[in-house]
Swiss-Prot record:
Subcellular location: Mitochondrion inner membrane
One GO term describing the cellular component: extrinsic component of mitochondrial inner membrane
Catalytic activity: a 4-hydroxy-3-methoxy-5-(all-trans-polyprenyl)benzoate + H(+) = a 2-methoxy-6-(all-trans-polyprenyl)phenol + CO2
Functional description taken from the UniProt entry: Lyase that catalyzes the C1-decarboxylation of 4-hydroxy-3-methoxy-5-(all-trans-polyprenyl)benzoic acid into 2-methoxy-6-(all-trans-polyprenyl)phenol during ubiquinone biosynthesis.
HAMAP family cross-referenced by the UniProt entry: Coq4
Top-level taxonomic group: Eukaryota
Note from the entry: This protein may be expected to contain an N-terminal transit peptide but none has been predicted.
Name of the protein in question: Ubiquinone biosynthesis protein COQ4 homolog, mitochondrial
Cofactor requirement: Zn(2+)
Pathway membership, UniProt: Cofactor biosynthesis; ubiquinone biosynthesis
InterPro entries: Coq4, Coq4_euk
Assembly, per entry: Component of a multi-subunit COQ enzyme complex.
The species this protein was found in: Drosophila pseudoobscura pseudoobscura
Length: 267
């Protein structure tokens, strides 16, 4: 288990009170520990927005209210994840170091977007492979892996990578669960992610997203989607340590069986 280092609180007299006031740590070379950081971590420290504890509390409260009022505000949901998810991310970090696959992810820090994935190759794979299923999911739902917001408010660069990884793997989780991106599918996936990762933002998205379902959707949610999501979320293996990029050629149903995933019966 990694040793966790906590920063001493900033004296109250030195804390800014305006949320809009922030500073960026732009010079990594001045940090004596920078030599031990990899490329992702050094770049993150250049772009990270530093905020005080008070500002973090305000951002967490404000983003949670905005996300409840309008679940389509992905910027607010992203902000909520960064300002409330640190403890859960440390737990995920422990999980990553419990497997060889997770350890390699933390060392290599792979990224998922159109400049890193050979989508033409994935399109050429047999239809029953995970890679082909992923490409089909993107096309069917008209989504792109380049749409994820960058992490900015987490202090620890390793935790920032974990949050980045979670965001970039979201569509892969949709794929392996065979869930679309409509409201029902998103709420169901959020329940699975919440139970699997412990991230508060996932619980929030699952609970408050369900409130906005229409009557017909809510009946299907309570009868089919919610029981299925709770069962899978509790029984499946941790998803964050899965090196998805090494599973493109794997049979998608074999991958589901390996992870302990049961698909929702179509009705």
């Amino acid at each position: 288990m990694m040793q966790r280092c906590w920063r001493l609180p900033v004296p109250l007299g030195k804390r800014g009170l305006a949320v809009v006031t922030h500073t960026r740590q732009a010079v990594v070379s001045d940090n004596p520990e920078a030599e031990n950081l990899d490329g992702f971590e050094q770049q993150y420290l250049k772009e990270r927005i530093e905020i005080t504890t008070f500002q973090r509390m305000l951002l967490g409260a404000g983003s949670s209210i905005a996300a409840i009022l309008d679940p389509r505000r992905h910027d607010m949901i992203a902000c909520l994840g960064e300002t409330t998810g640190e403890d859960a991310l440390w737990n995920i970090m422990d999980t990553m170091h419990e497997s060889e696959e997770g350890q390699r992810i933390m060392v290599e820090k792979p990224r998922i977007h159109t400049s890193t994935i050979d989508f033409k190759r994935l399109e050429s794979l047999p239809a029953d492979t995970f890679g082909a299923a992923y490409v089909k999911f993107l096309k069917d739902n008209k989504v792109t892996p380049d749409s994820r917001m960058a992490v900015r408010f987490l202090e620890d660069p390793k935790l920032a990578y974990l949050m980045t990884r979670y965001r970039e793997c979201h569509d892969l989780i949709h794929t392996v669960l065979d869930m679309p991106t409509n409201m029902l599918g998103e709420v169901a996936v959020k329940w699975v992610e919440a139970l699997n990762t412990g991230l508060p933002m996932c619980y929030g998205g699952a609970v408050f997203g369900a409130v906005r379902l229409r009557p017909k959707q809510r009946r299907a949610y309570l009868k089919h989607y919610l029981p299925w999501a709770l069962e899978n979320g509790k029984q499946m293996k941790p998803l964050m340590p899965v090196y998805w990029e090494e599973r493109w050629e794997q049979n998608v149903n074999e991958l589901r069986a390996e992870l302990g995933i049961k698909l929702l019966n179509k009705f």
